[in-house]
């Protein structure tokens, strides 16, 4: 930690979040589930050829899953040779792709779904009625008994286009029934690591408070204080958006925008609701940063004296997946973009902080819980507590979100700089 002694730390706050998690010893579930086989590939739009990001990738009949990265690429590991993968994304027809035996990466092309004219009549529906009915049906649509999820979490910070901080963790998430609040939902870290830029010129670093407890605090269907409650929804103007599909299932799309002026920023966004079950399946939110002072108070937890903070963007994506008659949390991603400068300096510097977590496996009948003493506190940060390591095989045997090309280059750069010291 000596190289970080002169750094100035900027601390930003995720919605609903207090802190990252503290380190812990590995749970017994850890190394016993190391996965030996893998399939690698990319997902593209069949018409445009554009790579598709944050696409759900799973093994049919199994519970292993991941998402594509922002380059549209994925690696999915299993305990036996995979025969095919199932790929699904909002607005596209789902597709099963056969895994080749030669080990070459797959290129999977998804066809955009064409909504029939008769289905556009959904525009006449009442958005508030859909949301209130969906809230009443949460107890029927989501898990009714505790489950244990294996997750992968990553947080990064970039100064302009350069990565200055990377932290990752494999976690266990104990998720209780949606008829209860999240007081018993807990996370324990199986394995984690931290990578930092060793350059002394990186005098400003970013600490994101949020971390692996992401999947507890930002499960918006369970934690309704944030958005999905009648008092909060009354603050928004709503209208029906164009319908779409997720996992080959028709979805209502409800568009939100701030409807009143209050002493805190509200969101623009879309809420997706399964047309048949009325389960929430996807929530996209973007913070209204038009009032810079309010947005700064909302986003920023702590900053050094003399530093000027300019919020640019804060977005949140929460995905749920329908399977075997039950809808479950599958992926959460939060992105901060902001600029900082010091007083009396002419130019400012742009920063981006990203946190994401994906559920990669689940146990529907766990034999144990995560005890309170094993659970991670929400008052710490991986920035402070995760071990610093540059082991190239650190995640061997675990499902993770495949690093993007730019992230891989950043890690390789850190390897080289570390070896030169």
Which role does the model predict for each range below?
Residues 63-73:
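Short, acidic Ser/Thr/Gly-rich low-complexity loop/linker segments typical of extracellular
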Residues 37-45, 72, 108, 120:
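A short, amphipathic beta-strand motif
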Residues 109-236, 247-250, 299-300, 305-421:
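Surface-exposed, low-complexity/disordered segments
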Residues 224-275, 279-286, 321:
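Extended beta-strand-rich segments in extracellular/periplasmic secretory proteins, especially
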Residues 37-39, 46-61:
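Short, ordered, surface-exposed loop/turn motifs in non-cytosolic proteins
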Residues 28-38:
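Beta-strand-rich domain onsets/edges
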Residues 49, 75-82:
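Short Pro-Gly-centered beta-turn/loop motif in secreted/extracellular proteins
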Residues 59, 86-97:
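A short, solvent-exposed loop/turn motif at the edges and junctions
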């Amino acid at each position: 930690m000596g190289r970080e002694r002169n750094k100035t730390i900027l601390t930003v706050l995720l919605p609903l979040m207090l802190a990252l998690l503290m380190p812990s010893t590995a749970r017994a579930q850890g190394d016993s589930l190391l996965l030996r086989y893998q399939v690698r590939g990319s997902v593209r739009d069949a018409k445009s050829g554009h790579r598709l990001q944050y696409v759900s990738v799973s093994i049919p009949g199994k519970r292993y899953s991941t998402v594509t990265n922002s380059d549209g690429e994925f690696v999915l590991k299993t305990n036996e040779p995979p025969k095919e993968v199932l790929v699904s994304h909002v607005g596209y027809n789902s597709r099963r792709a056969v895994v080749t035996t030669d080990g070459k990466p797959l290129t999977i092309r998804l066809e955009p779904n064409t909504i029939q004219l008769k289905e556009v009549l959904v525009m006449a529906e009442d958005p508030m009625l859909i949301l209130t009915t969906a809230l009443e049906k949460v107890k029927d649509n989501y898990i009714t008994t505790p489950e244990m999820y294996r997750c992968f979490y990553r947080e990064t910070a970039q100064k302009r286009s350069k990565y200055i901080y990377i932290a990752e963790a494999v976690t266990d998430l104990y998720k209780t029934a949606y008829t209860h609040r999240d007081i018993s939902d807990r996370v324990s870290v199986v394995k984690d690591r931290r990578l930092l830029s060793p350059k002394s010129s990186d005098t400003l670093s970013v600490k994101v408070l949020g971390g692996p407890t992401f999947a507890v605090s930002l499960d918006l269907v369970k934690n309704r204080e944030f958005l999905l409650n009648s008092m909060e929804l009354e603050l928004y103007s709503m209208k029906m958006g164009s319908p779409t599909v997720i996992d080959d299932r028709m979805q209502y799309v409800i568009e939100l925008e701030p409807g009143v002026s209050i002493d805190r920023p509200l969101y623009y966004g879309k809420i997706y609701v399964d047309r048949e079950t009325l389960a929430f399946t996807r929530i996209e939110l973007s913070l209204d940063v038009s009032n810079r002072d309010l947005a700064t108070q909302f986003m920023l937890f702590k900053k050094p004296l003399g530093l000027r903070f300019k919020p640019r963007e804060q977005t949140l994506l929460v995905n749920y997946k329908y399977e075997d008659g039950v809808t479950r949390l599958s992926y959460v991603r939060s992105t901060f973009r902001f600029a900082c400068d010091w007083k009396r300096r002419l130019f400012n510097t742009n920063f981006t902080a990203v946190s994401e977590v994906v559920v990669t496996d689940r146990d529907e009948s766990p034999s144990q819980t995560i005890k309170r003493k094993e659970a991670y506190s929400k008052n710490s940060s991986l920035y402070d507590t995760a071990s610093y390591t540059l082991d190239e095989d650190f995640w061997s045997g675990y499902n993770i979100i495949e690093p993007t090309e730019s992230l891989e280059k950043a890690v390789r750069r850190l390897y080289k700089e570390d070896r030169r010291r």
